[in-house]
């Protein structure tokens, strides 16, 4: 067994861990050990580097932990997919590359919780900007010299994108030019984490590329964190496995857990920090009975509303193997073409009821009919909307099954456990059908393939959701930030009741944000990095942002009305 000593040990080189490793080692007097259970960020592997290949990493286990849930009781007892990134970059290495920060009111809502007053949107915005380089330049809402490359959608990429956005507007919903700017609510172009050369902009590329040559940063891959070590109530180090070899590293200052919403509570529980009754079941010595560890688990559930496309403008031909070498060659040589986009270039956020204070439904538009993980491709020209609710009241949990660090935990999201979930999904299907019926899509819209136009009653729609809805791969909130009895960390990520230990990743969100989670996770890490370094927070932003204040969710008077049948 080898033993070494560092100022900080970071467990997990993902969206948050790479931010911390980079920011902490800006101080040459600080030493950092970054542990990653997966392998390097192989730049020659098109599966992780080509944006259009985003489904491939989810189909194997090289880059994906490939967790499965326990049978979900409200989803026909299905064991559902729970993909999480494995390798330098973490889930930013395998995600859909949608750059969505969340709604301003997400953060203002966090700040209404005791002790989280400094997590308002205006407190967080400077850290979003710090992390970002937007291809069309900075403004009051966007950064221009950060590590994360953000590419904006350009007109003319595919006519279906513009048609679907226009259809949303024709249905009476707002148009927005920037889902990350003044107004998230509405339909418009979607930003993505792709470099100017058409490569995936993971945090391994954006952050670690500038930090990995620093002498005060040691990166160890294929290193699976086993347990956090404690000296009394103070975290003193980490034991980890590299193959069959066990190693120990000691932390002079802090251990920083950045393993994600599944593995962070798993590591804490394995180390003796968690619900006491759970730990006793596995004969784990209790360091601290902390009941919230692994509780409050949240995710976004989504469904695919799919249509036949009457004109041959979809991406269906790109799914054929004989067309893919040409696409790949253009991407490899020039960084352009179909391979250089994730093809989520338009989308939106709407309120389905006037009394919703901010959007409760998200749309990703896609000019092909296929599941996110590449399965169940429709054998014809088609298009779809990925549609899902944003702040489900259902809560799940992550529970340790075994002391073996290689064993997956028990995961239960408890999807669709509340009546509000069902109402929102029914509303979402009906709103989507109304959008898809608008004149902007007349030349393209064929048959409704899924759910199928004949499914109309609440009972029929509910059965479709139970059988066909899937994860959006946004697990979060399982080590929540706050000061109530179920909070795990304080407003700086420090674990309650312990010293020298923080959790910094999507697990500390108290409530899931409205949209994709990579950008908020990076922001959280940027913000807490300043806290760890003892630096003064960035100056609070002073910009306006949209608040509905009870305004109608859609302008029915301006909506173009069409028959319900297609």
UniProtKB/Swiss-Prot annotation:
S-S bonds: none
Chain intervals for the UniProt region annotation (Disordered): 182-204
Pathway it works in: Amine and polyamine biosynthesis; betaine biosynthesis via choline pathway; betaine aldehyde from choline (cytochrome c reductase route): step 1/1
Documented EC number(s): 1.1.99.1, 1.2.1.8
A UniProt-annotated Pfam family: GMC_oxred_C
Purpose: Involved in the biosynthesis of the osmoprotectant glycine betaine. Catalyzes the oxidation of choline to betaine aldehyde and betaine aldehyde to glycine betaine at the same rate.
Family classification: Belongs to the GMC oxidoreductase family.
Listed PANTHER family: CHOLINE DEHYDROGENASE, MITOCHONDRIAL (PTHR11552:SF147), GLUCOSE-METHANOL-CHOLINE GMC OXIDOREDUCTASE (PTHR11552)
Name under which the protein is recorded: Oxygen-dependent choline dehydrogenase
Species the sequence originates in: Burkholderia multivorans (strain ATCC 17616 / 249)
